[in-house]
Amino acid sequence: MTLLEKTRKINAMLQNAAGKTVNFKEMADTLTDVIEANTYIVSRKGKLLGYSEALPIENDRMKQMLTERQFPEEYTQSLFNVGETSSNLEVSSQYTAFPIENSDLFTKGLTTIVPIVGGGERLGTLILSRLESNFTDDDLLLAEYGGTVVGMEILHEKAEEIEEEARSRAVVQMAISSLSYSELEAIEHIFDELNGKEGLLVASKIADRVGITRSVIVNALRKLESAGVIDSRSLGMKGTFIRVLNDKFLVELEKLKNN
């Protein structure tokens, strides 16, 4: 492939990702294909978002890292010291992508570190490694362009997460605001009783202890269930099984209690 063809292939990653869930594995595959190197996309916290290996590394520790999809904290933190692309780092470098315990097997191994930056912040790191042949200027151009594309997708994913979180919080707030004072009081007692995200509730016992009618509890649960905040299932004489579906519910409920 020519440099132009390789650039177009990376550009296609961005076009194909539009409106879809980000697939960092496919991105890593593309970068491995055009740069001809092992590719690891690592988040700022060391999570392995995606990887592709042109030459699999036969090392138990490396295999475990790939299986667990997590890079060591010390190594991840050290990557923040790399503020710009660092190319052709030898096995003796602290940033090498090759296992140091087997350095004698990879004496000619080379690593390139590309910081992934977006929105003025460090989002992660693109790590490339290969045996013997140096990373050329063309390789580095492709790597930095690839890092930019990956950064844009990380930002897009973060924006979607923030949007989803805001939507979940809004649903919870609307559901809680629909409750009457007595229904809200009932809900607070119910989840004090459950002491978690799910559990068995006997409405009559809570009604008697708190001094409210059973119908208040039933109405409160129905409102939350219709809003998609909880799921409830009657178990007959045993009571009602309740499970929280929206993670923001307990947080907002705790805020209300503290206020």
Curated annotation (Swiss-Prot):
Subcellular location: Cytoplasm
Residue ranges: DNA binding: 203-222
InterPro entries linked to this entry: CodY, GAF-like_dom_sf, GTP_trans_reg_CodY_C, Transc_reg_CodY_N, WH-like_DNA-bd_sf, WH_DNA-bd_sf
Entry keywords, A to Z: Cytoplasm, DNA-binding, Repressor, Transcription, Transcription regulation
Stretch list, region GAF domain: 1-155
Top-level lineage group: Bacteria
Record GO biological process: negative regulation of DNA-templated transcription
An example Gene Ontology molecular-function term: GTP binding
Any one GO CC term of the record: cytoplasm
HAMAP family: HTH_type_CodY
Role, per record: DNA-binding global transcriptional regulator which is involved in the adaptive response to starvation and acts by directly or indirectly controlling the expression of numerous genes in response to nutrient availability. During rapid exponential growth, CodY is highly active and represses genes whose products allow adaptation to nutrient depletion.
Family: Belongs to the CodY family.
Stated name of the protein: Global transcriptional regulator CodY
Organism: Listeria innocua serovar 6a (strain ATCC BAA-680 / CLIP 11262)
Taxonomic placement: Bacteria, Bacillati, Bacillota, Bacilli, Bacillales
Gene: codY
